[in-house]
Regions:
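FMN-binding flavodoxin-like domain, especially the glycine-rich phosphate-binding loop
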Residues: 3-35, 46, 50-155
Length: 155
């Protein structure tokens, strides 16, 4: 299966999880490509003065995994904007993951995953799974492994 892993990553954390997922999917016999959503301008809690530098195309992939950080207790505005501009995800399996700093899922992680799924479903995508990595957790490595295993098992 040809799987696109499309991420927005400010600090490199989300991108590092995407690379681990790519490695696992490739080892399972899939063609997996990591692509980055890139922006210029300002982005932060309450600040969304940015423009897209890169917006990866989704049409060539059989399935997609979207990854983004939580920012200000919500999905990063860059990923929210990127997903909104996609014309269609019809017929595509979709999974999502987020990385976050605060220690509880309810401090933005659940909301961000819900928003990603909502947007993807509105574009016709079939959301089949998700994961949250809490970067500040002492269990971070185990969380990454668990999310990568779970998402890889979907395809």
């Amino acid at each position: 299966m040809n799987i696109g892993i499309i991420v927005f990553s400010q600090t490199g954390h989300t991108h590092s999880v995407a690379l681990r997922l790519q490695e696992k999917l490739s080892a399972a016999g899939h063609s997996a490509t990591v692509e980055r959503v890139e922006i210029s301008g300002e982005l932060g809690p309450g600040v969304s003065n940015f423009q897209f530098k890169t917006t990866p195309e989704v049409g060539t992939y059989d399935a997609l995994v979207f990854g983004a950080p939580v920012l200000g207790f919500a999905l990063s505005p860059a990923m929210k904007g990127y997903l909104a501009q996609i014309a269609s995800l019809k017929g595509k399996q979709v999974a999502c993951f987020v990385t976050k700093s605060l220690p509880f899922y309810w401090t933005g992680g659940n909301q961000a995953i819900h928003k990603m799924g909502e947007i993807c479903e509105s574009k016709g995508g079939a959301v089949c799974g998700s994961g949250i990595v809490i970067w500040s957790s002492a269990r971070r490595e185990q969380m990454i492994t668990d999310v990568v295993e779970r998402l890889c098992g979907l395809f």
